[in-house]
């Protein structure tokens, strides 16, 4: 399954990208689609088949599952 991960800050996205390089996860830093945010920002496109709890951290704001050109919100951080 493909996911797009949104973060509270761009620096958190960069930090997570560095984490990915040192892990077995497949992902890349991307500019966020306008459908998902009104602000300019970076996020992570992640290809992942396990339980999302393995990648969730306090820096993650939202996670969307990607199905073609559709996005389904599957995780939102508590406010």
Residue map of PLM features:
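Amphipathic, hydrophobic secondary-structure cores in small proteins
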Residues: 1, 21, 26-44
């Amino acid at each position: 399954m493909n996911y797009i991960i949104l973060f509270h800050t761009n620096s958190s996205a960069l930090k997570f990208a560095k984490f990915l390089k040192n892990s077995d996860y497949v992902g890349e830093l991307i500019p966020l689609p306008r459908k998902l945010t009104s602000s300019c920002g970076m996020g992570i496109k992640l290809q992942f088949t396990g339980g999302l709890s393995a990648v969730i951290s306090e820096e993650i704001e939202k996670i969307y599952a990607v199905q073609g050109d559709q996005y389904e919100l599957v995780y939102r951080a508590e406010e």
